[in-house]
């Protein structure tokens, strides 16, 4: 059975989480889902990182086809993305659980 690797970058504000995500995305060639792709692209450029694809929240939930192979992605701010998806369906996120396993 193949082990599924999921990166979780958990740290305080202003600690470099997003820059670490940029480096992972660049190295792996995996796009990043984010609220504002243009702002994120400019932020990556300011760190000297280019060649990353960014996908908006809206594009992430509407693009693709169920028959397509699942595409690997990173998500910047998973809480915000979850909130966005739930709000689209008239739900309001009030809490969640997360495992601290590697």
Predicted regions and their residues:
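Conserved RecA-like ASCE ATPase "motif II neighborhood" in helicase/translocase motors
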Residues: 50-94
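Conserved P-loop
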Residues: 4-65
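Ser/Thr/Gly-rich flexible loops in soluble cytosolic domains mediating phosphotransfer, phosphorylation
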Residues: 94-102
């Amino acid at each position: 059975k193949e082990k599924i690797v999921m990166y979780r970058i958990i740290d305080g504000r202003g600690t470099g989480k997003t820059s670490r995500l940029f480096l992972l995305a660049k190295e792996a060639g995996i796009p990043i889902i984010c609220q504002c792709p243009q702002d994120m692209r400019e932020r990556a450029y300011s760190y000297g990182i280019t060649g990353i694809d960014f996908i908006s929240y809206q594009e992430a939930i509407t693009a693709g086809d169920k028959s397509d192979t699942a595409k690997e992605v990173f998500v910047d701010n998973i809480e915000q993305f979850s909130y966005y998806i739930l709000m689209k369906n008239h739900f309001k996120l009030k809490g969640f659980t997360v495992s601290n396993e590697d």
